[in-house]
């Protein structure tokens, strides 16, 4: 039986005014097939699918990930700070939770080819790893801008035998990569499954990705009870499309639906503050004339519209044209956000905030220096948001991924912005 607590996941996937299935007619059979598979295998654990997934994410992925105290951050902020260490999951980020779940679901559905988009390269890497483990052909679409700033992950994907296709149209970032992946899916819908990387897209993707990622907050609730003796006062997570955000928040808002969780894990916890940290870039706002936003803060400043199959909050012009977004972090560089996140912000359950590029870069160095943890630039936004937190209870920062993929970007951006970067490097010649 399903442990589903959110009735919307069994209808059209709407969350208040957001969500839905805004897709071309050619994709509706695939979306309907996936919705049926989601309800049968994920929500109702048909054929023991969820049991299989939970076993694989433990043995292959290395779950559970630890909850660790950050003493220097705690002293700096005058409150106990804990880190949920998704950087220690196999592959170095939270992305494997969803990628392994969806590739496994595709196997159960009888599909024999996987396509996926990626921004920072972490979702592409996780999908390529899952496909290698489950013997599925894999094709990844990645914007040319992201290919250039995330070369280590491009190499990792190819090591796992994935084909990586640079997308050269538009700004060459995540939005364009999603567009190209959807075109591929529409062309090859009979035998191909699209492993979308975030809580975006048409139903059932936002609910399904949330459910796979909510294993983060399942563990976090249990670990908090054991280590703190109580739930945290607040959880802070970065927000781009929103997969790690809903993973960190899902079990606290009561909407995640993956069977097999300990009793009470998904009961709403309204006393836990949830802070979603967006990329403030260089400044907020949208330049209508240039069709450009120097940020990726859809929750903070976006307006309602439709993108990639769902109604949500978007960075767009007054006439409804999606603009090019910006963030120093490739994984947050997206002009939209998941529909459930948009709804939870509207209802006041989640508090949106934003951090600019310079503050994120400074937080990258601070966590590396003070706690021995090199965070992804995405995570660095959440770490920087601790400066905005004024509560007095324990706070958890979700470390969505590790930062080795970002070292070239950090060195270049830190030098350009005169931020205290890595020590001077000397080249010694024999």
UniProtKB/Swiss-Prot annotation:
Source lineage: Archaea, Methanobacteriati, Methanobacteriota, Stenosarchaea group, Halobacteria
Alphabetized Pfam families for the sequence: PALP
Species, as recorded: Halobacterium salinarum (strain ATCC 700922 / JCM 11081 / NRC-1)
InterPro entries, sorted: Trp_synth_b_CS, Trp_synth_beta, Trp_synth_beta/beta-like, TrpB-like_PALP, TrpB-like_PALP_sf
Chain positions with N6-(pyridoxal phosphate)lysine modification: 95
One GO location term (cellular component): cytoplasm
Annotated HAMAP family: Trp_synth_beta
Family: Belongs to the TrpB family.
Pathway per the UniProt entry: Amino-acid biosynthesis; L-tryptophan biosynthesis; L-tryptophan from chorismate: step 5/5
Reactions it catalyzes: (1S,2R)-1-C-(indol-3-yl)glycerol 3-phosphate + L-serine = D-glyceraldehyde 3-phosphate + L-tryptophan + H2O
Record GO terms (molecular function): tryptophan synthase activity
Oligomer status and interactors: Tetramer of two alpha and two beta chains.
Protein's name according to its UniProt entry: Tryptophan synthase beta chain
The protein's role, per its UniProt record: The beta subunit is responsible for the synthesis of L-tryptophan from indole and L-serine.
Cofactor(s) this protein cannot do without: pyridoxal 5'-phosphate
EC number: 4.2.1.20
Keywords assigned: Amino-acid biosynthesis, Aromatic amino acid biosynthesis, Lyase, Pyridoxal phosphate, Tryptophan biosynthesis
Catalytic class of the enzyme: lyase
GO BP annotations, alphabetical order: L-tryptophan biosynthetic process
């Amino acid at each position: 039986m399903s442990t589903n607590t959110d009735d919307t996941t069994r209808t059209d996937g709407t969350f208040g005014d957001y969500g839905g299935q805004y897709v071309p007619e050619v994709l509706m059979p695939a979306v309907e097939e996936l919705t049926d598979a989601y309800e049968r295998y994920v929500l109702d654990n048909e054929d023991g699918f969820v049991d299989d997934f939970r076993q694989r994410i433990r043995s292959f992925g290395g779950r559970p990930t630890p909850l660790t105290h950050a003493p220097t951050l705690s002293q700096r902020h005058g409150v106990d700070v804990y880190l949920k260490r998704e950087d220690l999951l196999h592959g170095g980020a939270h992305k494997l939770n969803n990628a392994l779940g969806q590739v496994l679901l595709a196997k159960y559905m009888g599909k024999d080819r996987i396509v996926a988009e990626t921004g920072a390269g972490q979702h592409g890497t996780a999908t390529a790893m899952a496909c290698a483990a489950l013997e599925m052909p894999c094709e990844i679409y990645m914007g040319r801008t992201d290919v250039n700033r995330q070369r280590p992950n491009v190499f990792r994907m190819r090591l796992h035998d994935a084909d990586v296709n640079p997308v050269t149209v538009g700004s060459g970032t995540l939005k364009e990569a999603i567009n190209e992946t959807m075109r591929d899916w529409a062309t090859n819908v009979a035998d191909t499954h699209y492993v979308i990387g975030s809580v975006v897209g048409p139903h059932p993707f936002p609910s399904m990705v949330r459910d796979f990622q909510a294993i983060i907050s399942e563990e976090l609730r249990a670990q908090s009870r054991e280590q703190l003796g109580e739930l945290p006062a607040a959880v802070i997570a970065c927000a781009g499309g929103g997969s790690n955000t809903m993973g960190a928040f899902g079990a606290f808002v009561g909407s995640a639906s993956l069977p097999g969780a300990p009793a009470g894990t998904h009961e709403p916890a309204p006393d836990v503050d949830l802070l979603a940290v967006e990329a403030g870039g260089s400044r907020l706002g949208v330049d209508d004339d240039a069709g450009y936003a120097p940020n990726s803060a859809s929750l903070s400043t976006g307006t309602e519209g439709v993108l990639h199959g769902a109604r949500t909050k978007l960075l767009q012009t007054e006439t409804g044209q999606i603009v090019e977004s910006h963030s120093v972090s490739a994984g947050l560089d997206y002009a939209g956000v998941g529909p459930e996140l948009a709804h939870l912000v509207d209802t006041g359950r989640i508090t949106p905030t934003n951090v600019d590029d310079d503050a994120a870069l400074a937080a990258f160095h601070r966590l590396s220096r003070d706690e021995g943890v090199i965070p992804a630039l995405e995570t660095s936004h959440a770490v920087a948001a601790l400066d905005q937190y004024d509560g007095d209870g324990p706070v958890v920062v979700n470390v969505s991924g590790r930062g080795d993929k970002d070292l070239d970007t950090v060195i270049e951006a830190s030098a350009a912005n005169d931020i205290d970067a890595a020590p001077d490097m000397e080249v010694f010649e024999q």
